Every structure is written in C-alpha cells, then in structure tokens.
C-alpha cells in the first residue's frame, strides 16, 4: 500500500484523520481546545479517531472547549456522548468519561458568593439604602465578582450603592442557603466596615434612597423581626458594639500550590477589644 492509499478498516476504506489538538490535564485526562474551524463530518471522524488513541493511552476524562465560533460542533459532540459541564461568555465546556469505571470528573461550581456590608459610623449609625419599590431599608449587598476578594467586594458594593468610601474590618458571620440562584447554593458573608467618607451619592438603579440610620431605628423595622437573617445580623452588631463578639479578620497568605496571594479569615480574641469606629 502506498503512502497515498487509505487503509482498510473492517474491509471498508478509512480516511486517516489527525487527532484533535489536545493537552494532558493533571488527572490522567485531556483538554481539547478547538481553534481551527471544522465541519461536523470531519469533526466526528477526528473525534472517533482521537477516542481510539486516548483509550489506548489509558486517558480518562475528556474536556472539550468549544468557543462561540465552533457552535456548529455542539450537537455532534453531544451525539457522540459528551455532556455539558459549564459555560462562560465566550465558550462552552463539555466533558466525556472514557473508562467504564464511575466518573470522577468534578461537578460545575456549586455556589454563588455574595456579601452584605454593615457600615457603622462614630454615631453608631448604620448605612442603609431603600430597596426600590419595597419600602425596606437594607444594608448594601451584592455578588462577589470572579477573582475578587470578599472584603474588596464589600467595599465596592458600598461605594457603588452609596458613594461612601470604607475600610474593611472583619467578617461578622456567614450563612449558606440552597437552590438560591438557578438551583445553585448561596454563600452570604456579612462584613463590618468603617466609613472613611460620609457624603452619600446613592445608586439610582437599585435603591430609592440612602441614609445613615440610627441602629435602634434599623432594628425596629418590621422586616427585621420577621426575617431570621436580619434579626441575627442586628443581634451580632449589637454584641459587637458592646465588645462581646469577635468576627473574622483577614490575614494575607500564599497557598501550598503556588505563590498567589490569598486571604485567611480567622477569629482573633483581641479583635473583641478593637473599636468599630
């Protein structure tokens, strides 16, 4: 057979396809990143040839990264056994498990992370905004952005909603709820901050008004008595003002795996004596 002749597979002429471009992951699998346009017929043929090679090599999980420009390959990939794993604005990630043993591919992210910011000034007044159309005065809240620190998110949310600059002091408490956002769980961190400016410039999109409110007045809102979370937050703040409660302070660290900066939040007994304003 010459180099130009196609080989036979089960008596049928079989065209040779190059294996899809891939790199090994750290867990015995492969990551396929499609960058060159490909029609569905050639993709399926190349994918099947790739599977043959990966099985011989003992590969396990296959991660298929399809950018928006390769949306035509989603349906054929699913028909070949891939399932969705997660999506980002510019790509869809699909996965396939080769061995007959149970899959060990990790699930997609399970939680959304949010913050609430308690800002107390020297007059023991809290910073509140009135939620549009609700008549409820609330502390600044929001979602932590990808790659953003918890304390930085709290500072940002206060600035965005009220125009107030703040300094992070500690995490007072956090709670977990389930099926909160598209069936995902929710982690909510209540942060204590100290104001460094006082000129309120409210955000018009989400809140109707913003003001400094006496701690006693905020605690007397009907919603505070009806909602366990609000009630507990006020109770914790009250204990903090009495110096009988210590939250979690941040400590910069580097991880075991790399030298990237992270933060450990820990409870230090001496924090109970730290003034909040």
Swiss-Prot record:
Q: Which CDD domains match?
A: NUDIX_ASFGF2_Nudt6
The cofactors required by this protein are: Mg(2+); Mn(2+)
Stretches of the chain forming a coiled coil according to its record:
none
**Motif interval(s): Nudix box:** 142-163
Q: Which UniProt keywords apply?
A: Hydrolase, Magnesium, Manganese, Metal-binding, NAD
Q: Which residues form the Nudix hydrolase domain?
A: 97-235
Q: Which residues bind Mg(2+)?
A: 157, 161
> Among its keywords, does the record have Cytoplasm?
no
Q: In which tissues is it expressed?
A: Expressed in roots, stems and, at lower level, leaves.
Q: List the disulfide bonds.
A: none
- First-tier enzyme category under EC: hydrolase
Quote the catalytic activity from the record.
Answer: ADP-D-ribose + H2O = D-ribose 5-phosphate + AMP + 2 H(+); NAD(+) + H2O = beta-nicotinamide D-ribonucleotide + AMP + 2 H(+); NADH + H2O = reduced beta-nicotinamide D-ribonucleotide + AMP + 2 H(+)
Report the EC number(s), separated by commas if there are several.
3.6.1.-, 3.6.1.13, 3.6.1.22
Q: Which InterPro entries match?
A: NUDIX_hydrolase-like_dom_sf, Nudix_hydrolase6-like, NUDIX_hydrolase_CS, NUDIX_hydrolase_dom, Pre-Nudix
Q: Which domain of life is it from?
A: Eukaryota
Q: Its Gene Ontology molecular function terms?
A: ADP-ribose diphosphatase activity; metal ion binding; NAD binding; NAD+ diphosphatase activity; NADH pyrophosphatase activity
What SUPFAM superfamilies is this protein classified in?
Nudix
Which Gene Ontology cellular-component terms appear in the entry? Answer: cytosol
Record-stated family:
Belongs to the Nudix hydrolase family.
What's this protein's function?
A: May mediate the hydrolysis of some nucleoside diphosphate derivatives. In vitro, uses both ADP-ribose and NADH as substrates; however the relevance of such substrates in vivo is unclear.
Q: What is this protein identified as?
A: Nudix hydrolase 10
